[in-house]
Amino acid sequence: MSEKKSSSGEKLLYCSFCGKSQHEVKKLIAGPSVFICDECIDLCNDIIRDEASSVETLTGPRTDLPTPQELCELLDQYVIGQNSAKRILSVAVYNHYKRLKHLGKKDDVELAKSNILLVGPTGSGKTLLAQTLARTLDVPFVIADATTLTEAGYVGEDVENIIQKLLQNCNYEVERAQKGIVYIDEIDKISRKSDNPSITRDVSGEGVQQALLKLIEGTMASVPPQGGRKHPNQDFVQIDTTNIMFICGGAFDGLAKIISERSEKSGIGFSATVKSREERSASQVMLDTEPEDLIKFGLIPELVGRLPVVATLRELDEEALIQILLEPKNALIKQYSKLLQMEGAELEIRPAALQAIAKKAIARKTGARGLRSILEHALLDVMYELPNEQNVSKVVIDEGTITNGAKPLLIYHEQPKVSGAK
């Protein structure tokens, strides 16, 4: 019933859906023997909007696919340097999603996917590049750690757990998950101990590489529903990994030496050219990475063959680290400035301090990752004391704060003079 009489005899109208009276809502719209209030209309609009957006996302990645040049420009906003790696990634990702758009069309030429291997020192931006690409394309993304993976049947994570995490990240929408991006970090840590096949079982090294082969190439992976454990008599969610892009990354410490041994052949005799092994830095040597070097490092040939696109990232120099501190949209200096602004103070870091931070990060050999810990250490006391201080207008960090551990300089607001005070 949408109509009732009140105690005073007045006829009251009620919403047929939520039961609220005309006095409890702003608007009551009448239909044939039914009424609906403005609150229920808003709720219905929200439900329709949510369902429409989920249907749009099921169709896969963005329809307006950015060109490689546009992708590279978007990466420039978040990642400093590494121009060669950005170009390689942009072209590979563009071709991959262009291929997905043409999957339904009948053609004699079948386009195969090209997975990517990122080679570069720690803190050079491998993970950030993959994250930024996934965010730009609005596709499901997951980071997996290769060091936690083991062969099926052993204690540790199965390779199917990677797909399970990807599925969780898109609320178990299978169609979306099948067009996502998977970044497998620390791939170099599962290399076998030598380039010869092992006669003993290596469940966390070569065994994991073998397990990853079909997953990366394309297979139907069985994933437990809603993240449960695998057990018999259970229904599994079937995920086709053929159209999932896999990006593998690793530091490959020691690869430069293998490349040098291959490329810098020394002669014998008086007329032989003696080449200095210190002529090129490790980053420059790594640019000449060949599949045979990766196999000698410890990756199995089958896995190297499934990662045809190799992008090498250089070690970040002092200038690049200073740019990372200042220029990206989410630069560290901007982040800490925001934190201090919340306490009513401004952050100033002098040029000499920026250079000292960059030099310290290079000395630690942690790349861009070391910048945050250096800044955190320098600002720790200030962030501890500032909430109790009422009059600080600016926090200044100079070279001494970074190199000698001196306290940052605090500048206070001028106290207003009270007129008539004696």
From Swiss-Prot:
Question: Gene3D superfamilies of this UniProt entry?
Answer: 1.10.8.60, ClpX chaperone, C4-type zinc finger domain, P-loop containing nucleotide triphosphate hydrolases
**Mind listing the UniProt keywords for this protein, alphabetically?**
ATP-binding, Chaperone, Metal-binding, Nucleotide-binding, Zinc
Q: GO MF terms on file?
A: ATP binding; ATP hydrolysis activity; ATP-dependent protein folding chaperone; protein dimerization activity; unfolded protein binding; zinc ion binding
ClpX-type ZB domain ranges (all copies): 2-56
Give one GO biological process term: cell division
Statement: the UniProt record of this protein carries the keyword Transferase: no
List the Pfam families. AAA_2 (PF07724), ClpB_D2-small (PF10431), zf-C4_ClpX (PF06689)
Q: Where does ATP bind?
A: 121-128
The record ties this protein, via SUPFAM superfamilies, to: Glucocorticoid receptor-like (DNA-binding domain), P-loop containing nucleoside triphosphate hydrolases
This protein's superkingdom?
A: Bacteria
Q: Is the Cytoplasm keyword given for this protein?
A: no
Q: Where does Zn(2+) bind?
A: 15, 18, 37, 40
Output a single Gene Ontology CC term carried by this record. HslUV protease complex
Q: How does it assemble?
A: Component of the ClpX-ClpP complex. Forms a hexameric ring that, in the presence of ATP, binds to fourteen ClpP subunits assembled into a disk-like structure with a central cavity, resembling the structure of eukaryotic proteasomes.
HAMAP family reported for this sequence:
ClpX
What is the protein's known function? ATP-dependent specificity component of the Clp protease. It directs the protease to specific substrates. Can perform chaperone functions in the absence of ClpP.
Q: Which family does it belong to?
A: Belongs to the ClpX chaperone family.
Protein name per Swiss-Prot or TrEMBL: ATP-dependent Clp protease ATP-binding subunit ClpX
